[in-house]
Amino acid sequence: MVKRLIATSGFIALLACSAFAQDAKTVIDNATKAMGSLKTVEYSGSGFDFAIGQNVNPTQPWPKFIDKTYKRTMNFDTPAFRMERTRMQGENPPRGGGQQPVVGEQNQNQTTVVSANTPWVQQLELWMMPQGFLQAAAKNNATLATRTIGGKKYSVLTFTGQNKAKVNGYINDQNMVERVETWIDNAMLGDMLFDATYSNYKDFGGVKFPTKIVQKQGDYPILDLTITDVKPNVAVNIQPAAAPGGGAAQVATSEKLGDGVYLILGGYAAIAVDFKDYIVVIEGPQSEERASAIIAKAKELIPGKPIKYVVNTHAHYDHSSGLRTFMAEGATIITHQVNKPFLEKVGTMPHTLNPDKLEQAKKKPSIETMTEKKVLTDGNHVIELYHMTGIGHHDGLIMAYLPKEKVLLEADAYNPQPANATPPSPPSPYTLALVANIERLKLDVNRIVPVHYPADNRVVTRAELMRWIGRANGN
């Protein structure tokens, strides 16, 4: 799935050296005239969105959600945009992550008012739109080339984005922007292709606007919209959303679970175990920053020993985006065999836009796999790793059981809500599967360590898990 993600220098060179009779300004002017100028726009329709990095296994597309209604308001003059949608479950039965299953209808709103601190990847929501691209191309001294794809000739405008990646826009012979592509940094995939295609243009009040929009990241769609209504150049009022509280960086903290066994919090949870000659870490999640904090805390708690293994519960990006940091550390990744080809590629993907520790270290990844069960022991400590069966979240989902401590670490099957929250009815099939696996394996569990640890840092017991699925007596 990753072969299209690599931006080859040959492709960029082809765009740069191709001669073309018109200059870039003429192409921009002609396209702007043909499409109509936009200062603001409000468009609406329906379609699908997809959760990147949350596929049921690494060979499958991102899981789908239904956008029953979708509306986006954009201001190109004073850069800002707002998205409003009503979202529903799209995978039945649930397959993959992305906070599935969605029960009923879920209303989502997102507002961005562009400032000097707005990440470029967010700004691209404006500047990859057809008219937005033309405006950005004009402001950033775009160059012009020509390219023929499938027998069709395109004028290709190129400028450099704030992240130093090329942004290419393909203008067809009708002077319509048909495709915009660029590359953005992804913790797993590195220099990842991000492209948007626009088709079925129609006239709305003198402005040509696509009625089909498809965005892709990581070779699979992340958005697929059919547009039914467009209001060009209307008055818009996009106000910044209220700033979320608690913006301070999280600090890694720890709790002793047993002799030589430590829970590391301050983000996604991990466990560090003091083996005789080395350290085992369970879970390398979120980001290089979080993985570095886990590594530092593990070495502080267990000084003088290397981290030999890191257990990966599954390949979803939020649970795997720290693995490259562990690879740079020299640790071997333990994962289910379904993930091995993908994680091997992850360990070798170029990260030139935002070089990480592995990009700098140039180390070859070391990966060990398991199928149904794997036991790690030094004769004192024991970690039992089990493949979870009957769960649609991920085909290679692993849970880690420490029999001596009667502790079970699990990811995404049970994400505890506030202590006074009402249990869902019906329970999530993922949580039911977790309980079924615990009972199938006859594990003597007292304490659950969810990787998505509760915000109040409370101890999560097996009894709490059982109550959450409606078995109030805890049995």
Regions found by a protein language model. Name each.
Residues 255-297, 397-416:
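Conserved beta-strand hairpin/beta-sheet module of binuclear metal-dependent hydrolase folds
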Residues 17-21:
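Sec/Tat signal peptide C-region and signal peptidase I cleavage site
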Residues 214, 435-475:
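Divalent-metal (often Zn2+) His-rich catalytic cores of metallo-beta-lactamase-fold enzymes
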Residues 152-241, 398-403, 410-411, 416-417, ...:
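Gly/Pro-enriched, hydrophobic low-complexity segments
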Residues 26-116, 140-148, 288:
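N-terminal mature ectodomain segment of secretory-pathway/periplasmic proteins
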Residues 22-27, 94-167, 172-173, 184-192, ...:
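Flexible, processing/modification-adjacent segments and terminal tails
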Residues 222-275:
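Zn-dependent metallo-beta-lactamase
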Residues 289-334, 440-446:
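Active-site metal-binding motif and surrounding structural segment of the metallo-beta-lactamase
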